[in-house]
Amino acid sequence: GDDGTAILRSETSMEPSELTSMMVDNPTYHKNPKSLDAKLIYSLFIPCLGVGAMVFLLMRSMARGYEWEMNKCYGCDLCDDACPVRLFNAGDKLNIIYNSWNNEDDGVPLYSCLTCTACTNACPQLVDYDSYVDIRRSLIVGGPPATEIPHTLLQAVLAAEAEESADESFISVDDYPIDSNVGYYPGCVDYIDQEMIFSHVNEGTMNLGDTTTAAFTLFEDMGSEVTYLGRDFLKCCGHDQKWQGMTEVFEKLKSYNQKKLDESGIDTLVTSCAECFKTFAMDYELEDMKVMHTTEYLIENGFDMNLQTEEDLTVTYHDPCRLGRQMNIYEEPRELVRAVEGVDLVEMEHNKEDGLCCGVSSMMSCNENSRALRIQRFDEVKATGADVMLTSCPKCVSHFECLKFEGDPRHDFEILDVVSFLARQVNAKNQ
């Protein structure tokens, strides 16, 4: 309710007096009514009284909206039970939320949250914890500490790309060959891996730059005309910058890309990156443009290629957090895989809305805790007897491949993007 209480859900019809007796008081509601204002004054100190006051009031208004959201919590701890971070340290969701809210610090960093939405998925009140983490990170001047970023050089390059001075290095709409109303955006992991060595995972067997090539193999085999919108045309979507709290950088990237897309004549934007897909679809204002993940696009456009594997194959599928829990795309990748004759799709213990996170969010917190989470996921893969672990996110592929590169003989299965897996069968069919 508006006074900080939470009403328990029930399918049973009840009298108002009965409902009143079932209200649960949120113990934190009366504890911290002014603490956020103090944080905002500290974080947003602007000596200019005029503009500064307006900015402060705007940010306080935004934060107050999230304060109301947080007060829906009545402390049932179901979010803690679902939180993957809590499996390996004391950094559960409620600690992160309450400590940052009340200016208390018990050593649990705000950046330990994976923003995987497992907590909201388990919450009976559907509290949007991820949005709170997003706005709190945005109030931290300078963004996350360098120790949280494993690829600092790459992130610095992407941040520099956001500046207006970098615009001239990108091809204009007038000079770019756009010959279709459907555009494909590769994302940073895929594109950069084709241009340079992305990371040490390239020393293994995975080619992170393969997904775009695979996607166009499928488009061509289906007879779909799709324009490649390269990273020499569009900038980074800004997903990592947004969730690292680098709001100013994200807004610059968004402004540039949005203007370019509006002028391009594209009415459908397709990408194989779950993070890019979620960002374009939810964080941009592309009102006249349909944003689709490649698996969605293939299904909607009648994917039916009569594919089959050379020999029977057992596979399992890992649901990316951004594609699954956050965008509700579960069946499309599975439908595509099941369409291949000779494939037996076996689900892991945790799948779909209960799927485990790959452990690294927004290129942050690549540490022993995230490694332990991937080991647990690999144990689930092994339990299925799968020859191949499939997923639909290049970041998930790279993080899992990073662990596989360690050479543990128990991890003798292959890791592939669904699009790459399908393209492999198309190439075999066409030989």
Which role does the model predict for each range below?
Residues 67-70, 90-234, 240-271, 277, ...:
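Iron-sulfur-cluster electron-transfer modules
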Residues 73-79, 83, 113-119, 123, ...:
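Short cysteine clusters
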Residues 299-314:
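Acyltransferase donor/substrate-recognition loop-hinge adjacent to the catalytic core
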Residues 317:
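Hydrophobic alpha-helical positions that pack around
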